[in-house]
Amino acid sequence: MILTSKSTEFLRWAEEKEKNIPQNINELLVEIRDINNVKTTEITKIKEIIQTYNCCIYASNMDLKSNSNLLRFVESIGMKTYDCNNIDLNKISTITPRETSKVSYIPYTEKALNWHTDGYYDEKSIFSWLLHCVSPSSEGGENYLLDHELVLREYILRNDDINVLMEDGALIIPESKDTSRSEISTYIFSFSNAYKKLHMRFSMRRDNIASSTRASDAITRLKKIIESHCAQYSLTYKLCKNQGILTNNILHGRNSFKDDKVNRKLLRIRSYERL
């Protein structure tokens, strides 16, 4: 696809994308009877919604009995290989506040998370992820969601030239002393993957990213588009127990939260496959 505001191909894609903007969270919601034994019809519905919106929210009537059941569920959707992070060293990460000074990652605290895509700092691209709620926070903790394809659409319609944000050196991730990760230079938008679909690497946290001189102004415009022009497209939702989110690694964030007697606990799976 030619990515300019004057391209017939792009304008056709942009028009089709506009037709599939969710007007409310219910358009993303699928009721499933049992997360431990998801029916074929329920899986089909989830896949259809993800194909349309790059995101789906499911709600199970039954408690999750084991992590292996959750893995079987995501494999039926399309996940096959997984990112094992440095905290849990497992296919499934437990996202809950931790009382150890060794853990400085914001997801494992009660703090807010600004707009980002998962794994933007990794060499290998994360194409999809799941969050499953075991226990919600007593106050706050809402997730906010924004289809990255809508961000691309808005950027091109308002600025025309996207090429600088597709260069490998557009986004610079500083080295991490916590994980011994070297500095990474990468793209923000790319179609150069096996799926020929949009993949995005980005974070709104200023301490986490830098930019090339060429891309600096474009990134400033991108941030404005995410915060202002795309605000109408973002959806906010607080997961209840036995609910979850599946996405093609769209932009997302989290409000800060407070816990009462039971800590907020989510299970996270990140995959190298697109759904």
Which residue stretches match the model-derived regions?
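Active-site environment of non-heme Fe oxygenases that use a 2-His-1-carboxylate facial triad
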Residues: 2-43, 90-239, 244, 250-275
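TRNA-binding/sensing appendages of the translation machinery
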Residues: 47-56
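Surface-exposed charge patches
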Residues: 48, 72, 163
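Long, hydrophobic, well-ordered secondary-structure blocks that form the structural core
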Residues: 64-103
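Structural motif
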Residues: 59-62
